[in-house]
Amino acid sequence: MNKLGFGYLRLPKIDEELDYNAINEITDAYLAAGGRYFDTAYSYLGGKSEEAIGRCLSARHPRNSFMLASKLAGYDVKSYDDCWAQFNTQLARCGVEYFDVYMLHWLNKENYDLAEKYNEFAFLQELKEKGLAKKTGFSYHDTADLLDEILTKHPQVDYVLLQINYLDWESDAIQSRLCYETCVKHGKKVIVMEPVKGGSLATIPDGAKEILDRIDPALSPAGHAVRFAQSLENVEIVLSGMNTVAQVKENMADITPMTAEEMEIMQQAVSVIKGATAVDCTACGYCLKHCPKNIAIPQYFKLYNEYMRNPKDDWKITPVYDSITLKHGAASACIACRRCENNCPQKLPIVAHLVSVKEALENK
């Protein structure tokens, strides 16, 4: 069994520029291993993700050798015509004439209201009727109750893209299990994003790794995370943002679904990880464009987590923090406008965490 899809978001870079040679190599390795499903979005990497699809995938491989999914940034449109303009831009960037799967991006309560206002679900249906999208759906970041409401009103969609990983499975904020079960109730197949939680489950405390080694010592921490998501029966695709050939090879290996006993062991690792993680940030970056003070929120939270795991390393961590503040607002620059919190898929209390960052890392 292998349900792995290639998420074109966390692509390899050299000096902040995409490394197209490396992307070609990873793309080719994924296809050679039997992979077919590629996922991108209008807003990923400021449009460079879709451009990379066109350059590294569509221009180099036959169209029938892969499936391509992209997403409408419906939160940025102001009319139905805007939906068409954005969609046509995406086709051009990706170098294709249709998408196998086309989704509304990042539905929460606010963005769902916009989708209703601008008839974005009708737009998805029109694309399907014209053969420009074979399947439709949406990516989702809100409660199971709202998801139930959306799927009841719009049963014509085929997929829901959910954040699912073993750390968030029972989370009250993310509601991964409840949202998954809502999709099952409505007969919708699930595509998984963030199976490794933005990479944070690739590097876990030694105590958690020792627990996971009891399940399979040959698997890396990231491998265990991907296996968990692939083991869910109603999951059709598990997206992984791979940036090395080694990651492709491990993730594309044949996977045996987890047993109930293995799931129980994994929950023991969850307790260890949660106890060692101060801020549960995935570094998705959705907060950044809303911050009026240009605060490097994900970078600061990563440093703060490192500090909290070993405060004695502050002599190594604070210089890195200070160097970031030369180009970005410091944690102390926060004015508590909470625009970041309103756009955080993880529902983090970002303002409070920034106060903790300030107290730990500033003026050392």
Language-model segments: residues:
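Active-site mouth loops of central-metabolism enzymes
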Residues: L9-N21, K71-D81, E110-D113, K209-P217
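Short acidic/polar active-site loop segments enriched in Thr and Asp
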Residues: N2, R36, E97-D100, K134, ...
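Ferredoxin-type iron-sulfur electron-transfer modules in oxidoreductases and energy-metabolism complexes
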Residues: T259-A278, N294-S332, C337-E341, K347-K364
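Hydrophobic residues in well-ordered beta-strands that form the structural core
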Residues: D39-T40, S70, V192
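N-terminal binding-site loop/beta-alpha segment at the start of enzyme catalytic domains
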Residues: M1-F66, F123, E129
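Distinct, well-ordered alpha-helical segments
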Residues: K48-A59, Y80-L91, G95, Y112-A122, ...
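Beta/alpha (TIM)-barrel catalytic core signal, keyed to glycine-rich beta->alpha loops juxtaposed to Asp/Glu
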Residues: A22, L107-T282, Y286, H290-I295, ...
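A short, structured active-site edge motif that brings together acidic residues
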Residues: N64-D76, Y102-H105
